[in-house]
């Protein structure tokens, strides 16, 4: 392999890390600025939720298409298109003069966001042998952990000392740098052409949109609960129709043969089950600290920083842990630990010393980081190059929806305890944390289906290896 091509492949993880950082930052920085944007556009803060929902639904709808587009036109072409759309959408959002304009431009942003990270990860899957994939994905995930810490703080700073427009303008230099770097370092992997499954796209895409909408409606109590549940049931019906369609179609959008890969099926179901519990922490903890303990919003937001810090520190140790314990023992054990850590938040009180609140959050961050890395890599471990794009899309969709599902479930549990007479606000949060902890511990049973040898292809040592294939210069 030439030195030029080696440098090109070495730059690929940096491109994926940039994409992850942009998405993670954008997901958290906007919430802080919503009141300021609402004031500038002469709308109520509640109405600004449409700017968030429009992006979320667009991403949910188009993630499944990202794999087909990358297979058909190449990873470099689609990735540069995605970053371009995300960057131009950010510029347009900053220039918006009304809420309808902002919503439209957020949709454009969402089109880019739906393809950016999945295509970058697909390129990694095809470029690196499985035994090199774990440390590479670890590296890529780190900037994504910094984004949620930096987002709320940076959003507050920009709104306070500049204007809300800079919330979007900050994406532009990052996007331009990403484009230049991608043109130089992103390989243009393609596969054999296959016909686009338009019927499958409509069934699967609408199912995801309705499911996301139903969860949002249920969690935010925007409409009556029965309406939200009807939307969710309809989405499940469309998903069942897609399954029937996929069985009769030679080349469906998402092949059902994926789920014949045992580690993939366990990883997907495990992602959904465990994130029901872990997804509640960023939602419940700031609420309990503010509503129950009386903390100020800024302090409550900063209290989540130890979780992200623990996640970053744990990334450097995940590979060693997996090599020592294996995937099965690691995932079962760490999921039980996470469940116990979530449940122990029921022991916290306003009178506790601040370090007694910070330390459990730090430990939880380390545990969650280990779990997510192990869970995501075992899901992709045994996929072939032919089904890597579809499997990667399913994983991205699962991650997108399961976080919302975790928030909705924990909100529903909290509402149940709020209806109990004779309980204080703090006790209601305590009972909710105990319930979500039990759910998380129970989800560990899913990973007991793994064999002790599963994932060995990811963690075995190799003296010298190289990426699977480097495209020719013509690609």
Swiss-Prot record:
<feature type="transmembrane region" description="Helical">
    <location>
        <begin position="302"/>
        <end position="322"/>
    </location>
</feature>
<feature type="topological domain" description="Cytoplasmic">
    <location>
        <begin position="71"/>
        <end position="77"/>
    </location>
</feature>
<keyword id="KW-0472">Membrane</keyword>
<feature type="topological domain" description="Cytoplasmic">
    <location>
        <begin position="450"/>
        <end position="475"/>
    </location>
</feature>
<feature type="transmembrane region" description="Helical">
    <location>
        <begin position="350"/>
        <end position="370"/>
    </location>
</feature>
<dbReference type="InterPro" id="IPR004638">
    <property type="entry name" value="EmrB-like"/>
</dbReference>
<feature type="transmembrane region" description="Helical">
    <location>
        <begin position="222"/>
        <end position="242"/>
    </location>
</feature>
<feature type="topological domain" description="Periplasmic">
    <location>
        <begin position="219"/>
        <end position="221"/>
    </location>
</feature>
<feature type="transmembrane region" description="Helical">
    <location>
        <begin position="329"/>
        <end position="349"/>
    </location>
</feature>
<dbReference type="Pfam" id="PF07690">
    <property type="entry name" value="MFS_1"/>
</dbReference>
<feature type="transmembrane region" description="Helical">
    <location>
        <begin position="10"/>
        <end position="30"/>
    </location>
</feature>
<dbReference type="InterPro" id="IPR011701">
    <property type="entry name" value="MFS"/>
</dbReference>
<feature type="topological domain" description="Periplasmic">
    <location>
        <position position="160"/>
    </location>
</feature>
<keyword id="KW-1003">Cell membrane</keyword>
<feature type="transmembrane region" description="Helical">
    <location>
        <begin position="281"/>
        <end position="301"/>
    </location>
</feature>
<feature type="transmembrane region" description="Helical">
    <location>
        <begin position="161"/>
        <end position="181"/>
    </location>
</feature>
<keyword id="KW-1133">Transmembrane helix</keyword>
<feature type="transmembrane region" description="Helical">
    <location>
        <begin position="78"/>
        <end position="98"/>
    </location>
</feature>
<keyword id="KW-0997">Cell inner membrane</keyword>
<feature type="transmembrane region" description="Helical">
    <location>
        <begin position="394"/>
        <end position="414"/>
    </location>
</feature>
<feature type="transmembrane region" description="Helical">
    <location>
        <begin position="99"/>
        <end position="119"/>
    </location>
</feature>
<feature type="topological domain" description="Periplasmic">
    <location>
        <begin position="415"/>
        <end position="428"/>
    </location>
</feature>
<feature type="transmembrane region" description="Helical">
    <location>
        <begin position="429"/>
        <end position="449"/>
    </location>
</feature>
<protein>
    <recommendedName>
        <fullName>Probable transport protein HsrA</fullName>
    </recommendedName>
</protein>
<feature type="transmembrane region" description="Helical">
    <location>
        <begin position="139"/>
        <end position="159"/>
    </location>
</feature>
<feature type="transmembrane region" description="Helical">
    <location>
        <begin position="198"/>
        <end position="218"/>
    </location>
</feature>
<feature type="topological domain" description="Cytoplasmic">
    <location>
        <begin position="1"/>
        <end position="9"/>
    </location>
</feature>
<dbReference type="GO" id="GO:0022857">
    <property type="term" value="F:transmembrane transporter activity"/>
</dbReference>
<feature type="topological domain" description="Cytoplasmic">
    <location>
        <begin position="120"/>
        <end position="138"/>
    </location>
</feature>
<feature type="transmembrane region" description="Helical">
    <location>
        <begin position="50"/>
        <end position="70"/>
    </location>
</feature>
<feature type="topological domain" description="Cytoplasmic">
    <location>
        <begin position="323"/>
        <end position="328"/>
    </location>
</feature>
<dbReference type="GO" id="GO:0005886">
    <property type="term" value="C:plasma membrane"/>
</dbReference>
<feature type="topological domain" description="Cytoplasmic">
    <location>
        <begin position="182"/>
        <end position="197"/>
    </location>
</feature>
<dbReference type="InterPro" id="IPR020846">
    <property type="entry name" value="MFS_dom"/>
</dbReference>
<dbReference type="InterPro" id="IPR036259">
    <property type="entry name" value="MFS_trans_sf"/>
</dbReference>
<comment type="similarity">
    <text>Belongs to the major facilitator superfamily. EmrB family.</text>
</comment>
<keyword id="KW-0812">Transmembrane</keyword>
<feature type="topological domain" description="Cytoplasmic">
    <location>
        <begin position="243"/>
        <end position="280"/>
    </location>
</feature>
<feature type="topological domain" description="Cytoplasmic">
    <location>
        <begin position="371"/>
        <end position="393"/>
    </location>
</feature>
<keyword id="KW-0813">Transport</keyword>
<dbReference type="GO" id="GO:0055085">
    <property type="term" value="P:transmembrane transport"/>
</dbReference>
<feature type="topological domain" description="Periplasmic">
    <location>
        <begin position="31"/>
        <end position="49"/>
    </location>
</feature>
């Amino acid at each position: 392999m030439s030195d030029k091509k080696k440098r090109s492949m070495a730059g690929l993880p940096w491109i994926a890390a940039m994409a992850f950082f942009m998405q993670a930052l954008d997901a958290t920085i906007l919430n802080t600025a919503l009141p300021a944007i609402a004031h500038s556009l002469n709308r109520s803060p509640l109405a600004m939720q449409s700017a968030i929902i429009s992006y979320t639904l667009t991403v949910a709808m188009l993630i499944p298409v990202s794999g087909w587009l990358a297979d058909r036109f190449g990873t470099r072409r689609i990735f540069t298109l995605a970053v371009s759309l995300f960057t131009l959408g950010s510029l347009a959002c900053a220039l918006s003069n009304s809420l309808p304009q902002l919503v439209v431009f957020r949709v454009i942003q969402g089109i880019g966001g739906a393809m950016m990270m999945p295509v970058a990860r697909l390129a990694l899957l095809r470029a690196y042998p499985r035994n090199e994939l774990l440390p590479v994905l670890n590296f890529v995930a780190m900037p994504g952990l910094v984004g949620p810490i930096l987002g709320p703080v940076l959003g507050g700073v920009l709104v306070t000392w500049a204007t809300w427009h800079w919330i979007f303008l900050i994406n532009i230099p990052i996007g331009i740098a990403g484009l230049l770097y991608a043109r130089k370092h992103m390989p243009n992997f393609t596969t054999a052409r296959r016909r686009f499954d338009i019927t499958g796209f409509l069934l699967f895409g609408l199912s995801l949109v309705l499911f996301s909408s139903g969860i949002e409606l249920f969690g935010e109590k925007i409409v009556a609960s029965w309406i939200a549940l009807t939307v969710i049931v309809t989405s499940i019906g469309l998903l069942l129709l897609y399954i029937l369609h996929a069985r009769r179609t030679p080349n469906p959008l998402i092949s059902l043969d994926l789920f014949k890969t045992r580690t993939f099926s366990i990883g997907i179901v495990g992602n959904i089950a465990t994130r029901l519990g872990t997804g509640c922490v960023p939602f419940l903890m700031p609420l309990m600290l503010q509503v129950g303990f009386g903390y100020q919003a800024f302090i409550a937001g900063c209290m989540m920083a130890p979780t992200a810090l623990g996640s970053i520190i744990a990334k450097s140790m995940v590979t060693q842990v997996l090599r020592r314990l294996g995937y099965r023992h690691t995932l079962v054990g760490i999921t039980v630990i996470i469940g116990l850590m979530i449940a122990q938040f029921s022991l916290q009180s306003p009178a506790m010393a601040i370090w007694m609140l910070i330390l459990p959050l730090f430990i939880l961050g380390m545990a969650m980081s280990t779990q997510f890395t192990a869970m995501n890599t075992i899901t992709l471990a045994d996929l072939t190059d032919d089904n890597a794009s579809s499997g990667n899309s399913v994983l991205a969709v699962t991650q997108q929806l399961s976080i919302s599902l975790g928030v909705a479930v924990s909100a529903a549990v909290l509402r149940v305890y709020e209806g109990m007479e004779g309980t204080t606000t703090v006790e209601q949060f305590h009972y909710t944390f105990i319930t979500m902890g039990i759910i998380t511990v129970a989800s560990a049973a899913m990973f007991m289906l793994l064999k002790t040898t599963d994932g060995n292809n990811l963690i075995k040592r190799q003296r010298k290896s190289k990426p699977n294939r480097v495209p020719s210069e013509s690609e």
